[in-house]
Amino acid sequence: MSAVNPAGGDIAAGRSWPEVLNGLLDGRDQSADDTAWAMDRIMRGEATDAQIAGFLVALRAKGETVEEISGLVRAMYEHANLIEVPGATVDIVGTGGDGAKTVNISTMSSIVVAGTGAKVVKHGNRAASSASGSSDVLEKLGINLQLTPKRVAEVAEEAGITICFAVKFHPALRHVAAARGQLGIRTTFNVLGPLTNPARVKAQAVGVADPRMAPIVAGVFAERGNSSLVFRGDDGLDELTTTSTSRVWVVREGKVTEESFDPRDVGLDLVPVEALRGADAAYNADVARRLLNGETGPVRDAVLLNSAAALVALSPGAGTLAEQLRAGMAQAAEAIDSGAAKRALERWVAASNA
């Protein structure tokens, strides 16, 4: 399916790689249709590695805009295997790329949030900046990733949590793998994953490692009416971190508000990043099991905080951000301590292997 202008007509009309690339090199912001055209060519396999690399480097060098990213997202959705999951859904994810090699905080938080009764639809892949990616760890926990899109949606209804394994839902991304690998630098694709959840969830808690891109990601969410918390640790982590203060972009009703957050405001001590360090998938899965069995410490604190961020995004309440997060942390703690989070994982394992 070709990318289509909402006003009607094929967006490919009158565009070429030299036109788009020269515009970027001249420092001109591109329209959403321009970037959608480029992504459409890439997703079709009709762009060379040189054209893909040139586009990604030129776009990053100029500096991406909300409109440009929105165009890329639109075209990616045109080539994706999408699913429908009824009701209010939330995703907790980080862009990766912070190099910290932490345990899988967003993955553990997703299970805890499911334990509170919220419906979670993750969009995950192999390792980016964690010691192992969400998909790697979930496999070790017993989750079957090799499901059809239809079955993935059914699991969400049966277990209250599911994962869209990126390579199965965005198969056209294979066309960019070589160029991205050869470049070896951050590109726009580092932030597209959280923006292209195949279930098109309406609420997200998203960690963004790149300080340039965090407000852009928030702007894209605002443009499409999502309720989201976008954050970045001031030490560079793509989490709402307990290792430092963070910047938070609160997205509600089409507006973005930027705030500073200090974990000490919700009663948490600052810890060194080493306290959150992970290892391979087997080790990180064991950390998750211990968390769900009630182990306390820095990992639990970080998971409670990021679980709270998702709960606030899904159902914003009254009060300051810190007050809302504190309430969310209490919900998350109850999910762990009551065994509800552990039972959510057990349901998920059973449903994904049924």
Swiss-Prot record:
Amino-acid biosynthesis in keyword set: yes
Annotated positions binding Mg(2+) 1: 106, 239
Residues annotated as binding Mg(2+) 2: 238-239
Residues that bind 5-phospho-alpha-D-ribose 1-diphosphate: 94, 97-98, 102, 104-107, 122-130, 134
A GO cellular-component term linked to this record: cytosol
Pathway listed: Amino-acid biosynthesis; L-tryptophan biosynthesis; L-tryptophan from chorismate: step 2/5
Keyword Metal-binding recorded: yes
Any one Gene Ontology BP term: L-tryptophan biosynthetic process
UniProt cross-references to InterPro entries, sorted A to Z: Anthranilate_Pribosyl_Tfrase (IPR005940), Glycosyl_Trfase_fam3 (IPR000312), Glycosyl_Trfase_fam3_N_dom (IPR017459), Glycosyl_Trfase_fam3_N_dom_sf (IPR036320), Nuc_phospho_transferase (IPR035902)
E.C. no: 2.4.2.18
Cofactor: Mg(2+)
Gene3D superfamilies reported for this sequence: Nucleoside phosphorylase/phosphoribosyltransferase catalytic domain, Transferase, Pyrimidine Nucleoside Phosphorylase, Chain C
Reaction(s) catalysed (UniProt annotation): N-(5-phospho-beta-D-ribosyl)anthranilate + diphosphate = 5-phospho-alpha-D-ribose 1-diphosphate + anthranilate
Binding of anthranilate 1, residues: 94, 125
Domain of life per record: Bacteria
UniProt-recorded Gene Ontology molecular function terms: anthranilate phosphoribosyltransferase activity; magnesium ion binding
Keywords, sorted A to Z: Amino-acid biosynthesis, Aromatic amino acid biosynthesis, Glycosyltransferase, Magnesium, Metal-binding, Transferase, Tryptophan biosynthesis
SUPFAM superfamilies in the cross-refs: Nucleoside phosphorylase/phosphoribosyltransferase catalytic domain, Nucleoside phosphorylase/phosphoribosyltransferase N-terminal domain
Amino acids binding anthranilate 2: 180
Cofactor note: Binds 2 magnesium ions per monomer.
Record family assignment: Belongs to the anthranilate phosphoribosyltransferase family.
Biological role stated in the UniProt entry: Catalyzes the transfer of the phosphoribosyl group of 5-phosphorylribose-1-pyrophosphate (PRPP) to anthranilate to yield N-(5'-phosphoribosyl)-anthranilate (PRA).
Subunit structure: Homodimer.
Name of this protein: Anthranilate phosphoribosyltransferase
Organism: Streptomyces avermitilis (strain ATCC 31267 / DSM 46492 / JCM 5070 / NBRC 14893 / NCIMB 12804 / NRRL 8165 / MA-4680)
